[in-house]
Swiss-Prot record:
Gene3D superfamilies: Hexapeptide repeat proteins, MurE/MurF, N-terminal domain. The gene is lpxD. Pathway: Bacterial outer membrane biogenesis; LPS lipid A biosynthesis. Pfam families: Hexapep, LpxD. Catalyzes the N-acylation of UDP-3-O-acylglucosamine using 3-hydroxyacyl-ACP as the acyl donor. Is involved in the biosynthesis of lipid A, a phosphorylated glycolipid that anchors the lipopolysaccharide to the outer membrane of the cell. It comes from Helicobacter pylori (strain J99 / ATCC 700824) (Campylobacter pylori J99). This is UDP-3-O-acylglucosamine N-acyltransferase. The keyword Lipid metabolism applies. GO terms for biological process: lipid A biosynthetic process. NCBIfam families: lipid_A_lpxD, PRK00892.1.
Amino acid sequence: MKLSELLSAYSIETEFSNDFEVHALAELDKATPNDISYIDQVCYLKLLKDSKAGAVFIRKKESSKVPKSMQALIVDNPHLAFAKVSHAFKIPFFKNPQSVNEPKHFEKVTIMPNVVIGEGVEIGENSLIYPGVVIADGVKIGKNCILYPRVILYQNTILEDNVIIHAGSVIGGDGFGYAHTALGEHVKIEHVGIVRIQKNVEIGANTAIDRAVFGETLIKEGVKIDNLVQIGHNCVLGEHSIVVSQVGLSGSTTTGRNVVFGGQVGIGGHLHVGEFTQIGGKSAVGKDLPPNTNFAGAIPAMEIHEWHHFLAHLRTNFRKQQKTSLLQKAKGFFKS
């Protein structure tokens, strides 16, 4: 689709000089000359210098930063413009829904009844697919994988070898991404990325891992994820990390290797947790955490030694207040 056609289709008014063929939406640092990107935060302006994107949605006050090799598509709300045009690149779950009824054959794979498989799916030998599993178009499954009942793999999801996914989990669903109009309406951002799960990963029941806006949501080798976990779009979980039940990772959270998330931990978006760091249950993390540390506490999470001192201080002061209150009551009783 030509740039002019794309902008016209979604009623986006902006000036441009080169009406090139648009192939995709992409991150600035990974874009090609036929891709469009956007900037709605000043911190990303530094990426413009080395970007190969053909065009970028950007506000007028920041447009002078755009290099001559790239077109500045000046709009009031770059995020909203990006959300609108993303609908032109939506990837269907099943491109040809009728094809799911056609028989498909996979060598040395056990597929039980009532499994639904789309077009272009690859499944490695010795994999086991239980009843009720749904596999969308373009999914690639490695060797020795096990998908328990009612697992759903969205389009183009990649599972490497020896991956186990327990019942009811959804891999590759839409991330929670919306742009907002001046009237407060929410415009959905179509996610055109994927989820990649590397080898020897196990995922518990009823867990959701959202696909990337573009690029990959990546679960690295050896990660173990419990039941009822939510992992947002574009997250990266480092090798051999452990994620306990009811953890929620907001979009673009990244971690080093061997990180441990205790139950019900919540992580704000676009944060990094360093390798070998452990976070105690129910902690709320709102900043980057350094490697090789232990954190705990509700809001906000703090280094575990600080948390212990805080609790001790809180307990001591509370007991002092209780004693003071009892003495005051006793004095009042004897005076009466």
